Amino acid sequence: MSYESPGTRLRRLWAQLSPLPGGKWIFSKLLGLMVPYTGRLGPTVLHFEPGHVRAQLTERRSVRNHLRSVHAMALANVGELATGLAVLGAMPSTVRGILTGYSITYTKKARGVLIAESKCAIPEVTDS
């Protein structure tokens, strides 16, 4: 039995679905099943390649706070989704990654259609 890393599986799924009509939406829904907390927010992955992801979150009642703007944790969560997917997609198939921390700064209220974009380079992984 061979092991397929989550990043490899997601890249393969993206390659199969993204060219199809509605494929990005289907990929995003399947990703939401794999990551249920994030899936409840309903983000859509717009672009996915190793080290680069763009995800969209559309403002609606279920992601708003009492100030009638997108909740801060919804913003952080879609940012984490984009970052995690970019990192997972760039990692070698023999490696698994775990987020150990992140920091976010909020500069103003978020409203409307929001885009989270992550670009990263993964250093070479060695056994030592």
Where are these regions (language model features)?
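Terminal targeting signals and extreme-terminal segments of soluble enzymes
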Residues: 1-128
